[in-house]
Amino acid sequence: IDKIRKKESIITSNTSTIPRKQLVEGMPKSFAKDFLITHFFNPPRYLRLLEIVAGEEVSKKKINIVSEFCDKKLGKEVVICNDTPGFIGNRIGTYWTLIGMVEAVKLGLTVEEADAIMGRPIGAPKTGIFGLGDVVGLDLIPHVTESMSSNLPEKDMYNIAVKEQEKLGIEKILSEMIADGYTGRKGKGGFYRLNSNSGKKIKESRNLKTGEYSKSSRKVGLESVKAGKKGLRALVEYNDKGGEYAWKVLSKTLTYAASLVPEITDNIVNVDSAQ
């Protein structure tokens, strides 16, 4: 690219997790000063968020050119991030997924129960934690986790959650599912699947302990799901496994997010914008 590009032209990458400093390593300074990351969130047709990552050698003028173009011409909500693994959205979002699976297994929740809490009651998509994994692709999770984990300190809360996943056997569950072709919606299924029975498609969910599938039900026996309609406080204070699950996941995720300023970005507003 550097050999054929126009002089002073701006080059950007759509990587979602790889630090910019790794991408420009070994490249001439004349290229590095024109190189930024423009991470479009998927699917870009519907999601407005766009993360921009630059380096010290990139001028504010060029950052502003890219930022204004993405804002005014593409209609994106631009968030300026520091050059750290996963930037803002994926750093916090993948931690939420990690700790969501960890706490679900610890509390003995079914995938339906976990997703019923980590969906609409907290203002997230109804897919929740496990359903989201199916949408993204379970085969991508190990790669993203490894990429993030290897670039973060051992004592980072992210890596602590990774170790908990390994200890609880979640990593093994994912590996077995992927090996069997259960990579999510693009494969035979994931934590949820559609099974044909007498010509009818029946939605089934995976038992996290046995690995077996059984008919899935939209209704879960957690009163906290109903309590969540009154707000987050009512949800996290509700005295059942759902309320406890919500508190543990949200409190840890919010604590982690707060601890990352100013590492991942210079102000807390950008953290809220990226979630």
Identify the role of each PLM range:
Residues 1-275:
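N-terminal glycine-rich phosphate-binding loop for ADP-containing cofactors
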